[in-house]
Amino acid sequence: AHGVMIVCPVNWYQAPSSLKLMIDRLVCADGGNPDLSSTGGKDPMKAKRLELAGWPYPRHLAGRVFSVVVHGDAAGTENLRRILTDWMSDIGMIPSGHLALIDRYVGYLTPYATSHDDLDRDTDFQDDVRNAALTLIQAIKARRSGQLQPADRGLHEARPK
């Protein structure tokens, strides 16, 4: 994938558990070893020797662009948006742009029973999500054509882990 868009609710200032599980699995995409034979499967001593011998921490997702939309009905949307965008930036992904990184409240402090109706009525939020997706598409096209380059390309990371 050239780009990733995460759209999620906030639950008590946190990401939903399924998103947390995905993030945990993606640790292998940020410095992980694609060659299981080099560690004999999962032999920890071989893995430690390999790392201490000068592991390059390959960033398999670096250079891909991203968009994040976080929505909630009471609290925590801004915190979660920052957590997700910081994490994606930390692993070398590129934010698509201002309109692609949003946090919004839908049906603020209204009953759960009306949340679907609140979403249907909130056409501004729907436009925000649409703009986030369109911004991501434009960033993907710019990245593929070489017009969008990370400003830190070619620099050596002093502390790669």
Task: Map each language-model feature to its residues.
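Helix-loop-strand module that forms the ligand-binding subsite of alpha/beta enzymes
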Residues: A1-I91
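Glycine-rich phosphate/pyrophosphate-binding loop and the adjoining helix
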Residues: E78, T85-K161
